[in-house]
Amino acid sequence: MEATAGGSRRRPTLLRLLCPKKSLVSPPTPSLRWLLGSPRFLPPLTVAAALRSLPDGASSPDLQREAEEIRGLLVRGFDIVGAVHVGSADAGGALELARAVRERLYGERASHGMVGGCVELGTGEIRFVVSEGDGVEAVEVTEVVWEDDPGRLLWEKGCLLRCELLLKLPLYVPSDDTSGIEARFYSLIESTASKLRDPHVSYLIEGPRTTPGESHYSIILHGNDLNSVPHLSRNGSTEEYDANIVSCSKFFPAKRSLSLTRENADAIQITILSNQSFNSSKASTPAVEYFPAPALASLRAINLKLDILCYTSVDFPVAAAVSELVIPGLADQLSIMKKAIVSELTTQQPQLSPYHFVPPGLLIPVTTIYDTRYGEIEEKQSELRRNLHLRLQLPLDRPLLRISNALNFSIGGTDKKASKSGSSLLRDVHREIPSSGVSGGIISLIDGSYEYYHYLHDGIDDNGWGCAYRSLQTIMSWYRLQQYSSINVPSHREIQQVLVEIGDKDPSFIGSREWIGAIELSFVLDKLLGVSCKVINVRSGDELPEKCRELAIHFETQGTPVMIGGGVLAYTLLGVDYNESSGDCAFLILDPHYTGADDLKKIVNGGWCGWKKSIDSKGRSFFLKDKFYNLLLPQRPNMV
């Protein structure tokens, strides 16, 4: 135990962090980070994620604006648990800011422990203080633990609930006077939110299905059931919950994924049903009452699509989760949509759609609402995504929050041979290969996923002439899988048609078996994707190792596959392993000349994807000495 100045002793304070350290210290510029956790369902003083306060460097952030924007992102079950000042020594001030923004978020002071931190710009050193309750003095943290396996702590005892609700609300407005339309709309939304606990409303609770046709546990809860659910707080012991109350764990199989990915997200599904024939305990005669309208009125249909996620413990009673998480979450989303719609009630109504994401570097899901009227490339939507990238501390040169990046809650999920477009091609085959053998080298690899295209795919016999086409298809698949493009990977004929359309080839080229090279590939990428390319010319295969440093920089900054063309052969380069001191290097080659079945083991063992040295241990040259080579380095588009 640690002694205080007055001689009393206090217990040591442990702070557990699930988020990466760089999310708190990088970039090293003056800023404020909000810390997120789940005080109700995770161990006390646990930080699961960090969000950046906007704009950067603001000494006095607009707390009301911050609270409103965080409300739209935050999944119910997570909460603000602290703040960190980067470039300031005032950890206590950060803690008080966190308390203030949290109060604006929920309308009450936090009863759970709060964290304050400060980061020294020069050293990156972080100092934390904690207050274990409102009004409790902040004390220095005595132990900080950065979890090695944060996903396990988050999901071993945690789970998601998802509720979708389509609403078509009738808004009646006097035909000759729309001055009161906003008040009527607000009243309509508030009335809708209040009805979520009505006796005639039922909640169908279903467990996730991992395969089509698989049975799953399900129950139905009624509004009356929810009104009688007692307030249940986290106490660290599941035994104190009523044993007769169905817990969330009942809806999941004994073995379930302990991670959350875009391709496969498991959640308890909640469907809201309205039982208009609900039996009343009091018998009554059917009656009709007539209310004459004072003036002519028009009907405006307000279409809303609600879609919320909630985080809870698997031991938490599902009825309590619906009552205390799902219904407040739906009410929150209604309120957010109300503010977005009200200014356009008399014009074209926004088409608001919520989506859920777990972008790279973030362990917990976030929700954002997009207006899909004009598509994703519309300027306002692009600016919204850019601000989200800044707040979530995501890079600004790649699309990570587009609709195609959203979590997929469909039955099943994907495996190594399935892509979002339904492709059955092998993906990311290099992940199974052994080390390169370069001593002390630094490995620089492709960033993202790709599909392996090789000879004889799609029923096309291109053996002997189609290797560059296959390399181009692999590169095109990378842009598609990283969400830069939604167009299909082109066939040989479609590639030839592009080259004819731009005037590079004569019409007789279409349907031929003529080779293409790096320059033709650059033309096609520019035409179909608007992608620019850098070309490196090498006079001989012997000189390729001299380009390893430049290639390493490419993979670190661009991360795209590289096409290598020399003589009549073409390869796809996925990375390099380079020792700058010794000059020793190896090239990670994906060979399109493979003609067999898509058998991963056969491909790896046969060397069709593997590390190649310019000269191997037996003195044989992989690259031809008497041929010049062109290296095509496609650039990553700067977009979100």
Curated annotation (Swiss-Prot):
BP-aspect Gene Ontology terms: proteolysis
Coiled-coil zones: none
Enzyme class: hydrolase
Active-site residues annotated for this sequence: 467, 591, 593
Signal peptide: none
Record GO terms (molecular function): deUFMylase activity
EC number: 3.4.22.-
SUPFAM superfamilies associated with the record: Cysteine proteinases (SSF54001)
Superkingdom of origin organism: Eukaryota
InterPro entries tied to this protein: Papain-like_cys_pep_sf, UfSP1/2_DUB_cat, UfSP2-like_N
Alphabetically ordered keywords of this record: Hydrolase, Protease, Thiol protease, Ubl conjugation pathway
Job of this protein: Thiol protease which recognizes and hydrolyzes the peptide bond at the C-terminal Gly of ufm-1, a ubiquitin-like modifier protein bound to a number of target proteins.
Protein family according to the UniProt entry: Belongs to the peptidase C78 family.
Name of the featured protein: Probable Ufm1-specific protease
Native source organism of the sequence: Oryza sativa subsp. japonica
